[in-house]
């Protein structure tokens, strides 16, 4: 794959909630992260704000538009997209300088970990969402394809932006709405520069195997039979013990 130069700027702002008590003891701590990057040769960037690991908003660089993770957030705050565009321009200029100073040495590739799971317990015929969680990777470039029965799916898919981690790696979520069926199976295929080949994670509906009633009856009858045998054997051993003791007592009486 093509060589990549990546500049990732992360600014951490710690908002500390102080107790109103006289001791002013720290009761809780929250973190707001402003994460931005610019990538080459893709010539694209990302600008977003994160609160305690959840996205607040990101800026669509191409559309110069602020996209709030939840629409309700826009009622209480605002952010001018032009500010993000100005930051990305600075990132690009800094990246050019860093490329020269590093003799065009690319950043290291860290392959992702991939997990596929459902949003909620799966029941046949009830709509659900599959989640493809891509974690601990760098640089922030991945190609993700959903497959149903081995064929690409493009409808009902969505995704998050690249989300920062405390260790300067990234994570990302991809979603697929689906109707659970025993006839369908799904795969999330992830391609990243840290992988030798695309990585697939498989998911299919697994029906809970309940013990048939006939088998239950057999097992119950077998258990009852074993119990009865144990009781009979126990009674026989007790009778033999009593008989043996009586014989010994009669012999001792004769003496």
UniProtKB/Swiss-Prot annotation:
PROSITE patterns: IG_LIKE (PS50835), IG_MHC (PS00290). One of its GO terms (cellular component) is lysosomal membrane. Belongs to the MHC class II family. The keyword Transmembrane applies. Residues 204-216 are annotated as: Connecting peptide. Residues 26-109 are annotated as: Alpha-1. The chain crosses the membrane at residues 217-242. Keywords: Adaptive immunity, Disulfide bond, Glycoprotein, Immunity, Membrane, MHC II, Signal, Transmembrane, Transmembrane helix. GO terms for molecular function: MHC class II protein complex binding; peptide antigen binding. One of its GO terms (biological process) is antigen processing and presentation of exogenous peptide antigen via MHC class II. Residues 112-204 form the Ig-like C1-type domain. It is found in: Membrane. The keyword Membrane applies. This is H-2 class II histocompatibility antigen, E-K alpha chain. Disulfide bonds join 132-188. Residues 26-216 are extracellular.
């Amino acid at each position: 794959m093509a060589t990549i130069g990546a500049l990732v700027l992360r600014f951490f702002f710690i908002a500390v909630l102080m107790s109103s008590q006289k001791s002013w003891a720290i009761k809780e701590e929250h973190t707001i992260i402003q994460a931005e990057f610019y990538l080459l040769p893709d010539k694209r960037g990302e600008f977003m704000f994160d609160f305690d690991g959840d996205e607040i908003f990101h800026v669509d660089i191409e559309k110069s538009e602020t996209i709030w993770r939840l629409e309700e957030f826009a009622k209480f705050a605002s952010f001018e997209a032009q500010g993000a565009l100005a930051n990305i321009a600075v990132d690009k200029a800094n990246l050019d300088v860093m490329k020269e100073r590093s003799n065009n040495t690319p950043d290291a590739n860290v392959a992702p970990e991939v997990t596929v799971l459902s949003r909620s317990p799966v029941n046949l015929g009830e709509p659900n969402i599959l989640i493809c969680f891509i974690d601990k990777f760098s640089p922030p470039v991945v190609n993700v394809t959903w497959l149903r029965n081995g064929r690409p799916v493009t409808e009902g898919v969505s995704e998050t932006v690249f989300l920062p981690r405390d260790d300067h790696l990234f994570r990302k979520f991809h979603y697929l709405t689906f109707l659970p069926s025993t006839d369908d199976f799904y795969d999330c295929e992830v391609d990243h520069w840290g992988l030798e080949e695309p990585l697939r994670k498989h998911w299919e509906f697994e029906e809970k195997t309940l013990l048939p009633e006939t088998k239950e009856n057999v097992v119950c009858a077998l258990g009852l039979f074993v119990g009865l045998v144990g009781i009979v054997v126990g009674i026989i051993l007790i009778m033999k013990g009593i008989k043996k003791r009586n014989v010994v007592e009669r012999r001792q009486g004769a003496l």
